[in-house]
């Protein structure tokens, strides 16, 4: 099936919405040979590898771990400033949301304006779907349970 048809047939994603597909459902829709971009390993197009390295370096610097920076062929101050601004947030949940938003926006860089139904659009969708699935897995109830477990262990 042509890539433009696949890209056009995908359900829309919303940053704060529910994921329209499970990860396995999404993979079953992809063309043979599709390399799933991965924010952890940097697998994907050369463009994604470069953006991913810049974001990881910016996060490492914001956490004070410059020694963990990777070699990047360029340095985009836009991403550094976005990550730095996210780390200014005191509330950990809001900070994580801002960082997720940076990753979301960075994934959008893979879709060329001149070709919105291209292979890059599939990469963007894959990365954004991972973000939505991660965000869907976070709940206040689970967070409170973990907090209670940690604080009860500390009180003993």
Predicted regions and their residues:
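Extended alpha-helical surfaces
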Residues: 1-156
């Amino acid at each position: 099936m042509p890539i433009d048809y696949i890209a056009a047939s995908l359900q829309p994603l919303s940053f704060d919405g529910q994921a329209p597909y499970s990860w396995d459902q999404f993979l079953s829709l992809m063309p043979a040979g599709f390399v799933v971009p991965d924010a952890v390993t940097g697998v994907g197009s050369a463009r994604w590898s470069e953006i991913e390295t810049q974001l990881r370096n910016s996060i490492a610097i914001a956490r004070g771990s410059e020694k963990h920076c990777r070699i990047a062929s360029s340095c985009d101050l836009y991403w550094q400033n976005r990550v730095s601004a996210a780390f200014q947030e005191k509330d950990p949940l809001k900070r994580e949301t801002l960082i997720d938003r940076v990753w979301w926006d960075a994934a959008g860089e893979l879709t060329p304006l001149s070709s919105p139904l291209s292979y890059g659009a599939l990469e963007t969708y894959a990365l954004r779907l991972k973000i939505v699935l991660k965000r869907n897995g976070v709940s206040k109830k689970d967070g409170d349970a973990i907090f209670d477990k940690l604080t009860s262990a500390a009180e003993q």
